[in-house]
UniProtKB/Swiss-Prot annotation:
Name listed for the protein in its UniProt record: Shikimate dehydrogenase (NADP(+))
InterPro entries linked to this entry: Aminoacid_DH-like_N_sf, NAD(P)-bd_dom_sf, SDH_C, Shikimate_DH, Shikimate_DH-bd_N, Shikimate_DH_fam, Shikm_DH/Glu-tRNA_Rdtase
Catalytic residues as annotated in Swiss-Prot or TrEMBL: 66
Organism: Acinetobacter baumannii (strain SDF)
Reactions listed under catalytic activity: shikimate + NADP(+) = 3-dehydroshikimate + NADPH + H(+)
Role summary: Involved in the biosynthesis of the chorismate, which leads to the biosynthesis of aromatic amino acids. Catalyzes the reversible NADPH linked reduction of 3-dehydroshikimate (DHSA) to yield shikimate (SA).
Keywords: Amino-acid biosynthesis, Aromatic amino acid biosynthesis, NADP, Oxidoreductase
Length: 262
């Protein structure tokens, strides 16, 4: 019997999840159908519950419903609890289970690039939900110190305070985007600057070996500046594929290889 999956969001037409999951299915021999599902901004819960009531096997959640999905789950993975957001849902024994595969997707993408994560010092630009979701997996993968830089320093400080309890083994620090300096192994752009076109200026006194842009398929002043410095760089398509592979393997018990889809 064909398993039914969906990705839910608003907007949703831009999602590439169906093509990815159908490609994984073809490679692994899983019989599935994966659809986009547009939910009204005030209708996430009813749309999600009706999908599972109709026999849906699993659902991915995208903007702006990840926090709502988190709040509705009966059972959460550790990384979802720390992220306080869920992008992967499934029903088990009548209970709604939730996970967050974004951070693992980023780690898989960085490892596929053969950038070392062990004992690294990482700078993340932005202190929103995207940043919260990747800290724990980065630390698990070996990152030694993570500095979070944000326009509003208080927001970065709040995030560090929240995460210090959840990820006590990590060295976490908050700084203002106006105070960017020092040496880092990897800089990750998790701000919406690349999405909105706001130019983010990286000062000369900020040094880094690699640059990763979480967004993909759009112009990025962050990546332009990495290119000018002749620093190896990548954009977020690998992260998208990586998080999709993680969700696919949770649902179907088989893991496609990331390198086959990059």
């Amino acid at each position: 019997m064909t398993k039914q999956f969906a990705v839910i969001g608003n907007p949703i037409e831009q999602s590439r999840s169906p093509e990815l999951h159908h490609a994984f299915a073809e490679k692994t021999g899983v019989d599935l159908n994966y659809q986009k599902r547009l939910a009204p901004l005030d209708g996430f819960e009813s749309s999600m519950r009706s999908f599972f009531a109709e026999g849906g096997s699993g659902m991915n959640v995208t903007v702006p419903f990840k926090e709502q999905a988190f709040a509705l789950c009966n059972v959460l993975t550790e990384r979802a609890q720390i992220a306080k957001a869920v992008n992967t849902l499934w029903m088990e024994n009548g209970k709604l289970h939730g996970d967050n595969t974004d951070g693992q997707g980023l780690v898989a993408a960085i490892q596929a690039l053969e950038w070392n994560l062990e004992n690294t010092t990482i700078l993340i630009l932005g202190a929103g939900g995207a940043t919260r979701g990747v800290i724990y997996p980065l630390v698990q993968a070996g990152a030694k110190k993570i500095v979070i830089a944000n326009r509003t320093l208080a927001r970065a400080e709040q995030l560090v305070d929240d995460l210090k309890t959840a990820v006590p083994q990590a060295q976490l620090q908050a700084i203002s985007l106006n105070d960017l300096e020092g040496d880092f192994d990897i800089v990750i752009n998790a701000t919406s600057a690349s999405l909105s076109g706001d130019a983010l200026q990286l000062p000369e006194k900020l040094k880094f070996k690699y640059a990763y842009e979480m967004a993909y398929g759009k112009p990025s002043s962050f990546l332009d500046q990495a290119k000018q410095r002749n620093v190896p760089y990548a954009e977020g398509f690998g992260m998208l594929v990586g998080q999709a592979i993680e969700a696919f393997s949770i649902w179907n018990g088989v893991r496609p290889q990331l390198k086959d889809f990059l």
